[in-house]
């Protein structure tokens, strides 16, 4: 059997294969209320029908002020749970496990009114200047991640991913470019890591399932985080109980990264080897043979597919064919899926 189509365990959750749908914002909430719509149901469940092992929902805000836009999903109140439960049930029907990415946009929120950040430094010259979070407000953010995790459990999710990448709030704390604080949340790396550690520990108080963290392994900027900074972060995450690190890059400052097939895989490889923690690789992985090579050479443990799954919900089926595998079709499609 190919490695791509072997089972993989995240704590007590067994994935049927190692293909993961990357969380990707769809900006498709209709009433600015954070509630998932029929679009979200069709969008995510179709990828489960196509054979994806783990489907991770897009950035889901833990606070209303923490949305990237007014059209983002949310889990800051109980009214948002039922639509997500329906969606989770749909994913489970097709044999996929359900994940959700909990997030806070921080200074990258594009919303009316006040936005917040670790320091009063805007994302760029066109962005609003954020208000520096007080210690009390930081504790409330941590508490809201915990509340959102409890709601995720109520909705039936199998996996929680904490979004600490792409320039959003937790990443803003991690990077010295955006964190100029002089208290115990700023300065040395251990202080800058504190909010993420606090969030992981708070989530674990109400959630006994696997936790993934998405990071940006480089800021692509002078004075920012580089790969070597993420080795201690990853070791601390492992000690805090994180099962796997989803390794992306960039997003903290407004620069275009160099992009080519598999361009982020070396970062996943180095963090995996340097910190002794499982990683997920992503970034222009578009073919089954490419995914198989990454796994067979132990460069990562899971393959996280983004835009290729937007183009092709049946990526898993086609990857199986190229690797000489046969995967079970949804019974409704079996007459055509040979």
Swiss-Prot record:
Q: Provide the Gene Ontology terms for cellular component.
A: peptidoglycan-based cell wall
**Catalysed reactions, semicolon-separated:** A + NADPH + H(+) = AH2 + NADP(+)
Entry's EC annotation? 1.6.99.1
Its keywords, alphabetically, are: Detoxification, Flavoprotein, FMN, NADP, Oxidoreductase
Is the Iron keyword given for this protein? Answer: no
Q: Among the record's GO biological process terms, what is one?
A: response to toxic substance
The secretion signal range is: none
Answer whether the UniProt record assigns the keyword Flavoprotein to this protein.
yes
Pfam families hit by this protein: Oxidored_FMN
Instruction: Output one GO MF annotation.
Output: FMN binding
What cofactor is this protein dependent on?
Answer: FMN
Q: Could you say which residues bind substrate here?
A: 27, 163-166
CDD domains tied to this protein = OYE_YqiM_FMN
Q: Which residues cross the membrane?
A: none
* Gene3D superfamilies membership: Aldolase class I
Binding of FMN occurs at 22-25, 59, 101, 214, 306-307
What enzyme category does the UniProt record give?
Answer: oxidoreductase
For this protein, the record's InterPro entries field holds:
Aldolase_TIM (IPR013785), NADPH_DH_bac (IPR023663), OxRdtase_FMN_N (IPR001155), YqjM-like (IPR044152)
Q: What does this protein do?
A: Catalyzes the reduction of the double bond of an array of alpha,beta-unsaturated aldehydes and ketones. It also reduces the nitro group of nitroester and nitroaromatic compounds. It could have a role in detoxification processes.
Classification via PANTHER family: NADPH DEHYDROGENASE C23G7.10C-RELATED
Sequence similarity: Belongs to the NADH:flavin oxidoreductase/NADH oxidase family. NamA subfamily.
SUBUNIT field = Homotetramer.
Q: What is this protein called?
A: NADPH dehydrogenase
């Amino acid at each position: 059997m190919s490695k791509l189509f072997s089972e993989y365990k995240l704590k007590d959750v067994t994935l049927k294969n190692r293909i993961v749908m990357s969380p990707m914002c769809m900006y498709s909430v209709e009433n600015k209320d954070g509630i998932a719509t029929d679009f979200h149901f069709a969008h995510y469940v179709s990828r489960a029908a196509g054979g994806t092992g783990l489907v991770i929902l897009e950035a889901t805000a833990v606070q209303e002020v923490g949305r990237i836009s007014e059209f983002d999903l949310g889990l800051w109140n109980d009214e948002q749970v039922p639509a997500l439960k329906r969606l989770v049930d749909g994913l489970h029907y097709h044999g996929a496990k359900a994940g959700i990415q909990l997030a806070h946009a921080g200074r990258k929120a594009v919303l009316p009114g006040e936005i917040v950040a670790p320091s009063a430094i805007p994302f760029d010259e066109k962005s609003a200047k954020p208000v520096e979070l007080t210690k009390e407000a930081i504790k409330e953010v941590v508490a809201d991640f915990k509340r959102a995790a409890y709601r995720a459990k109520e909705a039936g999710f199998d996996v929680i991913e904490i979004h600490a990448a792409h320039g959003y709030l937790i990443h803003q704390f991690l990077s010295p470019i955006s964190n100029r604080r002089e208290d115990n949340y700023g300065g040395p790396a251990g202080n800058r890591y504190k909010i993420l550690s606090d969030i992981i520990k708070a989530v674990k108080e109400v959630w006994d399932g696997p936790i993934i963290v998405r990071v940006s392994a480089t800021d692509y900027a002078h004075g920012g985080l580089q790969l070597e900074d993420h080795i201690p972060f990853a070791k601390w995450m492992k000690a805090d109980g994180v099962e796997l690190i989803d390794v992306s890059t960039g997003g903290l400052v407004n620069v275009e990264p160099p992009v080519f097939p598999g361009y982020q895989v070396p970062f996943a490889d180095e963090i995996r080897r340097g910190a002794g923690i499982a990683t997920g690789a992503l970034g222009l992985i578009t073919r089954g043979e490419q995914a198989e090579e990454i796994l067979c050479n132990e460069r990562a443990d899971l393959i996280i597919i983004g835009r290729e799954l937007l183009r092709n919900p049946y990526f898993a089926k086609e990857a199986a064919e190229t690797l000489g595998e046969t995967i079970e079709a949804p019974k409704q499609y079996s007459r055509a899926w040979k």
